[in-house]
Amino acid sequence: MSWNYRIARKTLKCKVDLSDDYYEEDCFGIVECYYNEEGEIYATTESFIEPYGETLEELKWSFNKMKEAFEKEVLDLDNIVYAKI
């Protein structure tokens, strides 16, 4: 099994001030994406993530891997169908 970073879109439901009204807003971010042995997506992180590293080199590695996600198709987290592991 493998993983990579992917750009993802999801719709957020946002409350309008103190009223009972809501509005929806599309947003984009980076998620970790996990693949089964057939190369199908079986999981993603629930929240968007940001670059992180315990060392400067780890941070650079993470950032560069995240940049690669812009070359892949954007995932639609509202409609994704996850495969089995």
Feature annotation, model-predicted:
Residues 14, 39, 47, 78-79, ...:
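Residue-level marker of intrinsically disordered, low-complexity segments enriched
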